[in-house]
């Protein structure tokens, strides 16, 4: 079957938080934009893995009574739309960190609505990239399957928001494997849970789970259970079961397949134990399970610059800064709780545009988990709020390059957007 040849100014691959922002930014800049997404809905892991909270939108503040946005611009516009649809409000969780809770279906609905409002953006769902061809230092063509029909796209510029730098790597861009850096997680929802459990926290649950593990009633992984903040609605609560990091040297596809199957198999024994030993869960039933695991790390492109751990911890500012990071380093390892490394309160670090530009492919930009960063820095910059910001910056830069404009102009435009406080509702 001959693939139709589609020409566009900007091709965005991956419709998660970064990809949505990149496509809308490029479209608003006047670029004919195509957005490819492998699922039948937008939102990426925010929709498919049921992350449940948007981190990175607000400054850390242990004393303040209200959440303070780290910047204006598209990230806050998206958050405002999500709040308007769901009624969600920012909440402080611990150590002065603020998050915006959300329902996964609302995230996908807002993404659909906002992308659909852009006349220059064409969304292609159920689309999987199969090949990326580069020549003379530029990505020239991408071949994909869209609902099992071949599609060939010739873009002027590309934004890789796949979370795994898939297109950039297929085209030969140098990258580093971050797939073993952090543990994955499975989110599931229990119904008929006493709402008081959300107020009391999980101390009682964790005590019982520790006993179950010590007595070999449940496997050790069950101690890694946590409650998703703000998820308690009408007797339903979303829980996160953090798995273990990948084993270096073994194929990731093999490990991910095993994690998906084995973690789901744990849910009924876990639910049964909670029902028998935790009064608040006595009538609990398994309501639903996220369609896929939440993956916290993946392959990262080597960019023209690299966000360093020291840049994050030292809240370094840059005249080339096009996004702001406000979330601490959050490393999920084999420990039951994450290792948090904080920087100064009420402050942020800049992410320079060159961290979003592939080193050896002139027309390839990256955003979200694909950006060029050291391992520790990525544990901060990977969160949804920051991904919305880096996606917007990458989409703007790609549109400017496709139009023959200088990157300095793209930086200026993006920095102006960071100061934008009004939101299109």
Per-segment meaning from a language model:
Residues 25, 31-32, 37-127, 131:
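Conserved N-terminal/central alpha/beta ligand/cofactor-binding core
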Residues 19:
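N-terminal Rossmann-fold NAD(P) dinucleotide-binding loop
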Residues 4-16:
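Beta1/beta-strand and adjacent pyrophosphate-binding region of the FAD-binding site
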Residues 133-152:
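Conserved beta-strand-loop-beta-strand element in the redox core of flavoprotein oxidoreductases
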Residues 11-13, 22, 137:
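Membrane-embedded transmembrane-helix bundle of lipid-linked glycan/lipid transferases
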